[in-house]
Every structure is written in structure tokens, then in C-alpha cells.
Amino acid sequence: MNLGPTEILLILVIVVLLFGAKKLPDAARSLGRSMRIFKSEVKEMSNDDQRYEEQQQQRQIAAQAQQQVVNPVEIPQPQPTDIQRPQQ
């Protein structure tokens, strides 16, 4: 979409007619605030995504670590032995 100088001038004239010369600075200020809020929300959403991915990775690491835990060594219990009784 290529806008030439005449198209840009026409758009500016329409904007001035719609908002009026007095309200134009307020409208620009409001637009700037809205853009700033939008950018901060987008940045926060990407940070939330990164935190979620980090949590998922930590959960996977924890699950792998739990699978690798070795059962404690079991000490064999002494088995009863056959004792021969003396014959009488």
C-alpha cells in the first residue's frame, strides 16, 4: 500500500475535519497512551509465555530426576537354617 503525498494530505484533512483542531492534540495524546499500554501488555504476555515454558522445563527436569532415583539397598534378612539335633 503506497500512499503518495496527496493521499496523506487528504487523510490529514479528513482527520482535522472529524476531530477539529482543538481536539487533535488530545486525540494524539490518547492514541500515544493507548499504544504504550498495548505495547506493555504484549510484552507482559510474552514474559508470561517465557515463565510458563520455564516452569514446564523445570517440571520435566523434576520428573526425570524422580525417575532416576534409585531404590534404597535392601539388606537381606538372615534365613533360618536347618539345625541338626543330636540323636539320643
Swiss-Prot record:
Family, similarity comment: Belongs to the TatA/E family.
Keywords for this protein: Cell membrane, Membrane, Protein transport, Translocation, Transmembrane, Transmembrane helix, Transport
Matching InterPro entries: TatA/B/E, TatA/E
Protein's organism: Corynebacterium diphtheriae (strain ATCC 700971 / NCTC 13129 / Biotype gravis)
UniProt feature, compositional bias: Low complexity: 57-68
Protein name: Sec-independent protein translocase protein TatA
Membrane topology: Single-pass membrane protein
Compositionally biased tracts (Basic and acidic residues): 46-56
PANTHER family recorded: SEC-INDEPENDENT PROTEIN TRANSLOCASE PROTEIN TATA
Superkingdom of origin: Bacteria
Pfam families, sorted: TatA_B_E
